[in-house]
Amino acid sequence: MEGLLKLSTLVIVCMLVTAPMASEAAISCGAVTGSLGQCYNYLTRGGFIPRGCCSGVQRLNSLARTTRDRQQACRCIQGAARALGSRLNAGRAARLPGACRVRISYPISARTNCNTVR
């Protein structure tokens, strides 16, 4: 019986310790790429920026509330950029937040160290 009480106490302590971490779950790459999906043609071919693209950039900015979210969004953006390879115009990607009237604290670049994003 004493062993069961210790086990129950340990389980409760673990739940209390990990609960704050679960509530700070980072944004998913699916949410990032979903938000930026309408930007694809602009980022690869140029032309005008679709209204839906800027809406997605603004939505992503509002979803990335915590440092952890912003770091994860940075990693997801870099992963998507790597997948696009030479089709991605890095200059357009770097200018996109400003063109959509969104201020972010880090440059959109393959060289950005996402661990330093706050």
UniProtKB/Swiss-Prot annotation:
Record GO terms (molecular function): lipid binding
PROSITE patterns documented for this protein: PLANT_LTP
InterPro entries cross-referenced by the UniProt entry: Bifun_inhib/LTP/seed_sf (IPR036312), Bifunc_inhib/LTP/seed_store (IPR016140), Plant_nsLTP (IPR000528)
One GO cellular component term: cytosol
Keywords annotated in UniProt: Disulfide bond, Lipid-binding, Signal, Transport
Membrane-traversing stretches: none
GO biological process: lipid transport
Cystine connections: 29-76, 39-53, 54-100, 74-114
Classification via CDD domains: nsLTP1
Alphabetical list of SUPFAM superfamilies matching this protein: Bifunctional inhibitor/lipid-transfer protein/seed storage 2S albumin (SSF47699)
Keyword Signal included in the entry's annotation: yes
Signal peptide: 1-25
Family: Belongs to the plant LTP family.
Biological role stated in the UniProt entry: Plant non-specific lipid-transfer proteins transfer phospholipids as well as galactolipids across membranes. May play a role in wax or cutin deposition in the cell walls of expanding epidermal cells and certain secretory tissues.
Entries under PANTHER family matching the protein: NON-SPECIFIC LIPID-TRANSFER PROTEIN 2-RELATED (PTHR33076)
Entry protein name: Non-specific lipid-transfer protein 5
Lineage: Eukaryota, Viridiplantae, Streptophyta, Embryophyta, Tracheophyta
